Amino acid sequence: MFDEVIYMGVHGVAISATVRIKRISWGTVARWLESAARYAERFNQRKLKGFVIHELQADEIRTFVGDKEQVVWVLTTLEVWSRLWISVVVGRRNFRNIKTGILDTLQRGRIERRFLFTTDGFEMYEWAVKRLLAGVCIYGQVIKKRREDRVIRVERRLLLGTKSELEEALFHSEDSNTLNTSFVERHNLTIRQGSAYLGRRTPCHARHSGSLMGQMALMMMYYNFVRPHMALKFGKMVRTPAMQAGLVAKRLSFREVFTAFFIFFFIAVAARCCRLEFKQSRQGFWRE
C-alpha cells in the first residue's frame, strides 16, 4: 500500500482524496509522503549526476504556500536531449536562487562542448549566466509579448556567443530548430499536473516551502527514473530520462527505488517491538 500511496501523490491526488480512496488515516498518508520525499531527495543526490549536458532550458512556476499572499517560485532546469529534470529550487524569484539552480546543474552534469542554454526574459538569468557560464555555453532568451493573456509576439535574443555559434549549436541539436523554451514549459505543465500543490484554482496547497520542496524532490525522482517518457520511446521500448542520459540501464519501480527505505522501515518496526517486549518483560520481572 505504501507504493500505491506514493504513486497517487505524484499524480495530483491530494492527501484528503488518498485518505478516502485507501481508507487509512490522514496522518499515515502524510507521514509516508514525508518519508518518501526525504528518501527521494537522498536518492536524487546520489544518482542524478555524471550525465552530459547537451542543451539546457530553465523556467519558473509561480505558486504560493500558506496563503495566497506568500508567493513562491519553483525554478526548474531541464536537459533537453535526455528530458532529464536536473535541478529544482523553491523560493523567491531572485538572483540568489537562479544562481543556486545553475550551480546545482553544473555540479551534477558534465560539459563536453559548448551547449545551448535558453530561458525566458527575466534579467537575473542574464546576470547569472554571464558570471557562471561564460565560455561554456551559448545563451539566448525567448521573450513573449502578451495582450489579454494571449501571445502576440515572440522576440529572441542572443546574449552570449555569436550567430554562427548559435547556428552550429542548433545544427547539432536533435530537438531545437530555433531558440525556444517549449520543452521546459511542457515539462512544467507535467509538474503542475502531477502535484496537487501546484494546481491552479485549487484549495490544496503546501503549508510551507519545505513541504513543497519535498513534493518536488519526490516528483523529480519519479519523473527521471520511474515514469516512461513518450518522446523517448524507441519502437516498443519505453525509456525514462535517466535511461536516455545513461544513468540507469532500465526503468525503475517504486519498490526498487525504496528498497533500502523498506528495509530500514521494517528494521525500525522490529526494533521497536523488541524494545516494547523487553520493557514489558522487565516490568513483569520486578512485579514478581
Per-segment meaning from a language model:
Residues M1-A270, C274, F278, G284-E288:
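Residue-level recognition of single "structural anchor" positions
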